[in-house]
């Protein structure tokens, strides 16, 4: 979770009830504390899985060596993204070669994300997208969709074990005076 440094102020009435606060409160007077945990999910395309609940992206699918396999990473952007110091999506495939030329980053049901708010770096084992949190306030609370293709290599496992293609999210989850924070 990403913890905010915003102080919670409140006043207690004579009867012990919460009378005033700078935070949202529910109908019983309890303060609703917001912790923003950015979620990341990664799926592979399977045209046989298209239905009203999804767009064909599922947990697993069958492909042949040489196929260009479509992947989709979804990332929920925290409400306080601009306060973070680090927000990085890393993809590390196994027996696949990411085609970074096919990477598209967009807001769910919306426009492409400005290329000025991230840096894409390809390495020998996948890619890294380093977002610039201070420039991302317009994406607060939105879901980003990162779509791309990866070629299934001839070194691929041809068993039911499959070939892993992991994505991770690295972010600062404690904003402190030094600006270093703690990675989550």
Language-model segments: residues:
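Extracellular adhesion/glycan-binding regions together with long Ser/Thr-
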Residues: 1-6, 62, 110-155
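Solvent-exposed beta-hairpin/edge-strand motifs
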Residues: 90-111
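Short beta-strand elements of extracellular/lumenal beta-sandwich folds
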Residues: 63-87
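Surface-exposed intrinsically disordered loops and tails
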Residues: 48-59
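Primarily secretory-pathway and cell-envelope proteins
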Residues: 4-50
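Serine/threonine-enriched low-complexity regions used as flexible
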Residues: 3-24, 73, 85, 137-184
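One face of beta-strands
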Residues: 40, 75, 101-103, 165-169
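Surface-exposed loop/edge segments in extracytoplasmic proteins
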Residues: 99-100, 111-117, 178-180
């Amino acid at each position: 979770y990403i913890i905010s440094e915003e102080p919670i102020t409140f006043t207690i009435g004579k009867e012990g009830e919460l009378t005033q606060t700078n935070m949202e409160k529910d109908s019983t007077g309890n303060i609703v504390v917001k912790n923003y945990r950015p979620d990341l999910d990664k799926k592979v395309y399977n045209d046989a899985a298209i239905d009203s609940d999804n767009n064909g992206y599922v947990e697993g699918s069958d492909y042949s060596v040489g196929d260009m396999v479509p992947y989709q990473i979804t990332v929920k952007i925290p409400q306080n993204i601009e306060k973070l110091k680090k927000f990085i999506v890393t993809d590390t495939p196994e027996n696949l070669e990411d085609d970074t030329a096919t990477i598209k980053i967009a807001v769910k049901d919306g426009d492409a994300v400005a290329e000025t708010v991230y840096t894409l770096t390809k390495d020998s084992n996948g890619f890294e997208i380093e977002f610039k949190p201070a420039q991302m306030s317009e994406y607060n609370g939105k879901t980003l969709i990162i779509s791309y293709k990866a070629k299934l290599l001839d070194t691929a496992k041809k068993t039911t074990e499959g070939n892993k293609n992991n994505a991770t999210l690295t972010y600062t989850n404690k904003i402190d005076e030094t600006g270093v924070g703690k990675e989550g």
